């Protein structure tokens, strides 16, 4: 791949999830699934440009497996493969032991918490 990200940008290749089946054995097609939010960093920029003109090195490095928000980055196609170009700020976490997840799964779900009060409670 010939892509060199600038400043605090990183290039991420999504990690594919295993095939999903419903309890009744129906295979869920890729078009019906959400895109994975786990990826491998394949390129990093030189660092974040600070107000004083200095570059602050990035925390992530090539080869890191990262977790990111489903709306993070911009998709680009390079040599027939789809990559995400995003700011380091869009990375939620670095997965320290990805080998323990192989064959398993990572699920990321955002939940909205609602607070309701019953009548008579403060």
UniProtKB/Swiss-Prot annotation:
Instruction: Enumerate the Gene3D superfamilies for this protein.
Output: GroES chaperonin
Pfam family for this entry, one = Cpn10
Q: Keyword Chaperone, does the record have it? A: yes
Cell compartments where the protein resides? Cytoplasm
Q: Give the record's GO CC terms.
A: cytoplasm
Please provide, alphabetically and separated by semicolons, the GO molecular function terms listed in this UniProt record.
ATP binding; metal ion binding; protein folding chaperone; protein-folding chaperone binding; unfolded protein binding
GO BP annotation list: chaperone cofactor-dependent protein refolding
- Function description: Together with the chaperonin GroEL, plays an essential role in assisting protein folding. The GroEL-GroES system forms a nano-cage that allows encapsulation of the non-native substrate proteins and provides a physical environment optimized to promote and accelerate protein folding. GroES binds to the apical surface of the GroEL ring, thereby capping the opening of the GroEL channel.
Complexes and interactors: Heptamer of 7 subunits arranged in a ring. Interacts with the chaperonin GroEL.
Full protein name: Co-chaperonin GroES
Question: Which species is this record about?
Answer: Aquifex aeolicus (strain VF5)
